[in-house]
């Protein structure tokens, strides 16, 4: 039978509940326990798929095609475990399910209320994750802050959950903030006390307090917090501000979070294997030479809009012993100031996904600059579509070529709507979503990077390369290096003779993991490193490779 952990937050929003949940998952998995993590979001949207990235950050896509909160990306990256649509629950989806049941008559004419019907549906979703995943421990993060009206049904549901499984099979973690007041020179505990008081009023007594702080918390302060909040001193965990989110599991392990959880849940403490994670953090703190990467996007004012892309770049840099020097470049600024002014000195360019025509001309200009200047380039989703448009306009002779999404009346719709999307009216959850196979063409950069004939990648799009232009693109020098198994959909393109120029219709960033970077991102960083001044050892290695390559070439004499 599964054990259950519930993570709540108090005092302020964005306090790091998701990272705490993901870190605990990592620590449990390091001891041999299987873990699944779900997020309960208190907003009324059914899912974040139709929300602006400025409102919500990126939309993370699961294997089964759910559009979810970005925290699910943290869960997957930290635990190296795939989540599903069951792991993302919103107030909107709960109410939708309950109302649908009422319309079908499932409640036999009864009055439908928040308690027990809404809270019962929430509890059912948590049980469903446990049954579907078969995990030893199910961790549930409750979005929002204790005291918010929107979160009350979720908090009531996790209070009721204690009656479902018994007190020995669940634990409550409350993440809170200890603010430092400079004038008094003290960390203040009163906000934490009041936050726990709010929880107790609902009927939840936390087992562990994870206290965010920018400085160490001494034992006297832990004793004070524990006494006022009703938890043992050892269960008051310091969560110091970290230089990287990947350092948080190590910090929480040193503070004893996992041991306390195992004790509360009556689980055996096995030997912990965090060696690879410790090595990863050591690399983060002792990076190699910096690689300058420009991320050219529409939503660069909010970094979370491209969270998985940035993490994938970091993973690749870690493996390649490089540090990431990321430049956030607004695509619209390129339209005004030109790519040569904003991208000069970059070692690589990434154009990620997005929607709408704002900034597209800037992305197209950035791609042309990377192509002509022979700067390594990686395009993702809309980034691939922009690469196709750039080639059509500047190399294939298709003046005015565009996407039918951006310019419905274009004479050359090199990107067009997928046939199965023709009659789709609703926006939410109706795109080509989730994992699909991609067949890799032999003797291509993609085949070299992947080392596989067929790969499986996550998608989120409505528009695709227009096969009416396929032969023209191939004849003009484009290489289609990946397509759907039936050959109908172009999934991956590249340019031969360029140091690194490739773009994909899918989202490889969702599959990148610390210590296991995605092949496309690793290839990009490896190509970018070749632009850096070589150390003496590296210069010898490159010369050796050049000599070997020369020896392998057939002789032109005789």
UniProtKB/Swiss-Prot annotation:
It comes from the Bacteria. Residues 542-558 have a biased composition (Polar residues). GO terms for molecular function: ATP binding; CTP synthase activity; glutaminase activity; identical protein binding; metal ion binding. Disulfide bonds: none annotated. Homotetramer. This is CTP synthase. Catalyzes the ATP-dependent amination of UTP to CTP with either L-glutamine or ammonia as the source of nitrogen. Regulates intracellular CTP levels through interactions with the four ribonucleotide triphosphates. Belongs to the CTP synthase family. SUPFAM superfamilies: Class I glutamine amidotransferase-like, P-loop containing nucleoside triphosphate hydrolases. NCBIfam families: PRK05380.1, PyrG.
């Amino acid at each position: 039978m599964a054990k259950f952990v519930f993570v709540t937050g108090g005092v302020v929003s964005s306090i790091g509940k998701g990272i705490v949940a993901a870190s605990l998952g990592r620590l449990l998995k390091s001891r041999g326990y299987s873990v699944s993590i779900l997020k309960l979001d208190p907003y009324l949207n059914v899912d974040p798929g139709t929300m602006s990235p400025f409102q919500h950050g990126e939309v993370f896509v699961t294997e089964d095609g759910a559009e979810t909160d970005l925290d699910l990306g943290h869960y997957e990256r930290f635990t190296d475990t795939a989540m599903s649509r069951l792991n993302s629950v919103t107030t909107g989806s709960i109410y939708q399910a309950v109302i649908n049941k009422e319309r079908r008559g499932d409640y036999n004419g009864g009055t439908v209320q928040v308690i027990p019907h809404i809270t019962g549906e929430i509890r059912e979703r948590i049980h469903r994750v446990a049954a579907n995943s078969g995990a030893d421990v199910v961790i549930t993060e409750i979005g929002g802050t204790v005291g918010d009206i929107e979160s009350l049904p979720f908090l009531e549901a996790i209070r009721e959950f204690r009656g479902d499984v018994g007190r020995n099979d669940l634990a409550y973690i409350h993440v809170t903030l200890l603010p430092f007041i400079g004038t008094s020179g003290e960390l203040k505990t009163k906000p934490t006390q009041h936050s726990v008081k709010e929880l107790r009023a609902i009927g939840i007594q936390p087992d562990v307090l994870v206290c965010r702080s920018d400085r160490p918390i001494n034992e006297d302060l832990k004793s004070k917090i524990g006494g006022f909040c009703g938890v043992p001193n050892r269960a008051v965990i310091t969560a110091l501000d970290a230089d990287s989110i990947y350092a948080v599991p190590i910090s929480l392990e040193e503070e004893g979070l996992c041991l306390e959880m195992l004790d509360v849940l009556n689980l055996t403490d096995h030997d912990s294997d965090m060696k690879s994670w410790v090595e990863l953090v050591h690399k983060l703190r002792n990076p190699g030479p910096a690689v300058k990467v420009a991320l050219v996007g529409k939503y660069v004012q909010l970094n979370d809009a491209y969270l998985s892309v940035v993490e994938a770049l970091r993973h690749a840099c870690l493996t390649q012993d490089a540090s990431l020097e990321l430049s956030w470049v607004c695509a619209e600024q390129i339209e005004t100031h030109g790519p040569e002014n904003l991208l000069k000195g970059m070692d690589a360019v990434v154009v990620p996904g997005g929607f709408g025509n704002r900034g597209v001309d800037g992305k197209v200009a950035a791609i042309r600059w990377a192509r002509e200047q022979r700067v390594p380039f990686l395009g993702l989703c809309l980034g691939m579509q922009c690469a196709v448009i750039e080639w059509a306009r500047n190399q294939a002779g298709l003046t005015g070529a565009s996407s039918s999404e951006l310019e419905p009346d274009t004479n050359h719709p090199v990107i067009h709507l997928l046939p199965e999307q023709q009659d789709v009216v609703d926006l939410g959850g109706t795109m080509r979503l989730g994992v699909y196979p991609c067949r890799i063409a032999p003797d291509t950069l993609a085949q070299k990077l992947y080392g596989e004939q067929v790969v499986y990648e996550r998608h989120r799009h409505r528009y695709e390369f227009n096969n009416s232009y396929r032969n023209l693109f191939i004849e003009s020098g484009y290489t289609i290096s990946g397509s759907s198994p039936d050959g109908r959909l172009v999934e991956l393109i590249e340019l031969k003779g360029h140091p690194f120029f490739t773009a994909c219709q899918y989202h490889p960033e969702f599959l990148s993991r610390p210590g296991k970077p995605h092949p496309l991102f690793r290839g990009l960083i490896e190509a970018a490193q070749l632009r850096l001044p070589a150390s003496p050892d590296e210069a010898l290695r490159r010369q050796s490779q050049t000599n070997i390559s020369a020896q392998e070439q057939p002789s032109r004499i005789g």
